[in-house]
């Protein structure tokens, strides 16, 4: 399953999202959701404990001036990569 988080993690039900995530799922953080990937942040630790692969949309990171603050452990994807992830997964859940 491909999960996308496009709102600030402070405005999302992260607990519900984690309950629905399974091994092999991917999560792409977009729009204000990219703030969840800030290094040493509360939400980064929570998301990294899930059995998923975590990505940020690089254009949204750049638009918010956060390029130097995103954890190195989080994958960066372009719009083309995002489309590839969409094709990879049969379903998608938007948060």
UniProtKB/Swiss-Prot annotation:
Signal peptide: none annotated. Disulfide bonds: none annotated. One of its GO terms (cellular component) is sulfurtransferase complex. Keywords: Cytoplasm, tRNA processing. One of its GO terms (biological process) is tRNA wobble position uridine thiolation. Pfam families: DsrH. Its main location: cytoplasm. It is found in: Cytoplasm. PANTHER family: PROTEIN TUSB. HAMAP family: Thiourid_synth_B. Part of a sulfur-relay system required for 2-thiolation of 5-methylaminomethyl-2-thiouridine (mnm(5)s(2)U) at tRNA wobble positions. Belongs to the DsrH/TusB family. Heterohexamer, formed by a dimer of trimers. The hexameric TusBCD complex contains 2 copies each of TusB, TusC and TusD. The TusBCD complex interacts with TusE. This is Protein TusB. The lineage of its organism: Bacteria, Pseudomonadati, Pseudomonadota, Gammaproteobacteria, Enterobacterales.
């Amino acid at each position: 399953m491909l999960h996308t988080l496009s709102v600030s993690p402070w405005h999302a039900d992260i607990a519900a999202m984690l309950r629905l995530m399974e091994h092999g799922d991917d999560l792409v953080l977009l729009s204000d959701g990219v703030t969840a990937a800030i290094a040493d942040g509360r939400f980064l630790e929570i998301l990294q404990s899930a059995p998923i692969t975590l990505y940020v949309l690089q254009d949204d990171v750049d638009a918010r001036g956060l390029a130097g603050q995103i954890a190195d452990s989080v994958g960066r994807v372009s719009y083309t990569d995002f489309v590839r992830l969409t094709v990879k997964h049969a379903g998608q859940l938007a948060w």
